[in-house]
């Protein structure tokens, strides 16, 4: 609706940007480097970050970088994940029909992973997104999941990704056996003010607009509200563009952004 008004070639601030068009901050680049190292060393790793900070986007980038002849990426995201469902999902992604009973499915998955590594020369990369929602039962199962050949061999990398509370959960004594196995930890921070300004400029440019549409004052209000969280920035920018187009305004100032935030986002 606002695209023709501003002259956009496509809608800006979308989540489904091609990997080649994604904006990256130094924090994102560090995360990608750490994830690649995790995969190379077959680590068990923990990635945390606030909602909308770009964790899942980083996983998309990682997936696009890995050679499919060397790695098999297995992505799991289920708020009600149980061990049986987990094994079933991983096995299906490995083109195996999962056994009905949990113990059988677990042994089946172990065999499938070893076959992938030893016979096909590919390393499994298991990505568990929204891991802060994992149940106690599922978290405890991870310890057994990582136990290959009496804990002397690790044929895969396992990456847990979730909100900051995941780190706090794993600090509980009952999960000490799990935390001792974590080979890499990283917390993805939000963008700072300059990074957010560059982020907005990047998304406008990718959508076909080279000129700035948001005043400095508008960006200051936006940063104050969003804290540099990409998803919040996207939402407010889209709503502000729509509001500006409806009012026949070519420039988005601090007054409009503040009004949009107050009326649409309740702050």
Regions found by a protein language model. Give the residues of each.
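A short, basic N-terminal segment
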Residues: 1-41, 258
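Short hydrophobic/aromatic beta-strand immediately N-terminal to the Walker A/P-loop
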Residues: 45-48, 75, 127
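Conserved AAA+ ATPase "SRH/arginine-finger" region at the nucleotide-binding site
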Residues: 76-79, 170, 183-196
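Mid-core helix/loop region of P-loop NTP-binding domains shared across ATPases and GTPases
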Residues: 82-85, 97-141, 150-154, 191-196, ...
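Short regulatory helix/loop adjacent to the ATP-binding pocket of P-loop NTPases
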Residues: 63-66, 166-181
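C-terminal alpha-helical "lid" subdomain
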Residues: 60, 155, 177, 194-267
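Conserved NTP-binding/hydrolysis module of P-loop NTPases
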Residues: 11-13, 70-73, 81-100
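Walker A/P-loop nucleotide-binding motif
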Residues: 41-64
């Amino acid at each position: 609706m606002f695209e023709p008004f501003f002259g956009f070639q496509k809608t800006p601030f979308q989540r489904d940007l091609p990997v080649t068009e994604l904006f990256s901050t130094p924090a994102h680049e560090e995360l990608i480097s750490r994830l690649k190292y995790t995969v190379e060393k077959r680590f068990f790793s923990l990635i945390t970050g606030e909602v909308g900070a770009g964790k899942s986007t980083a996983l998309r980038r990682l997936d696009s970088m890995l050679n499919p002849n060397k790695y098999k990426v297995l992505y799991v995201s289920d708020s009600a994940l149980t061990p049986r469902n987990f094994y079933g999902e991983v096995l299906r992604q490995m083109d195996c029909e999962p056994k009905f009973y949990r113990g059988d499915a677990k042994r089946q998955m172990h065999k499938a992973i070893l076959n992938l590594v030893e016979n096909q020369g590919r390393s499994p990369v298991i990505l568990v997104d929204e891991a802060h929602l994992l149940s106690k039962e599922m978290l405890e199962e991870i310890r057994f999941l990582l136990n290959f050949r009496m804990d002397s061999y690790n044929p895969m990398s396992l990456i847990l990704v979730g909100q900051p509370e995941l780190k706090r959960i794993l600090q509980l004594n009952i999960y000490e056996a799990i935390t001792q196995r974590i080979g890499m930890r990283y917390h993805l921070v939000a963008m700072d003010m300059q990074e957010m300004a560059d982020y907005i400029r990047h998304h406008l440019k990718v959508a076909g607009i080279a000129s700035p549409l948001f005043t400095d004052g508008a960006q200051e209000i936006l940063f104050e509200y969003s804290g540099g969280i990409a998803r919040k920035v996207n939402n407010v920018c889209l709503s502000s563009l729509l509001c500006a187009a409806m009012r026949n305004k070519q420039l988005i100032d601090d007054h409009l952004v503040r009004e949009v935030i107050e009326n649409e986002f309740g702050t």
